[in-house]
Amino acid sequence: MKNILQVSSLFVFLSTSVIAEVLPTADEVKAVLIKVEYGKDLQFRATAEDWKEIRPHMLPARIDPKPALWEGLADATIIKKDGKSMKVTMWMPASGQGAFSVGGKYYRGGNSSRTLKAILDAHQRSMKRAHEQKN
């Protein structure tokens, strides 16, 4: 029985261990289309450099086998350099670590308030880029 519990504990540990590779790095990203849902109504196109500033605030992250009902923060459609795209939904938990989901799997980690700030900063940079292109 003790061996079964040890194997079971090891499985839980491995299945919820740190997961970073689920989120592509900035080097893999061509562009990110972001729609903010939390307290704002913003849609914009972010760059790989913007993603480089956002991603660290979502990590380290672990699989959450029993996610709660959280308020939506933002949706990001990530267009990768290999032509594939993926959707990342970011959530705003009432307390504790941040949260996001990819492909129906939920993850806890990072800090959703800092993620939101990084997204809003990216929006400001996108507005500045758009203004500079007009001039």
Region locations from a protein language model:
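Function-determining sites in protein domains
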Residues: A20-N135
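N-terminal signal peptide c-region/cleavage motif recognized by signal peptidases
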Residues: S15-S17
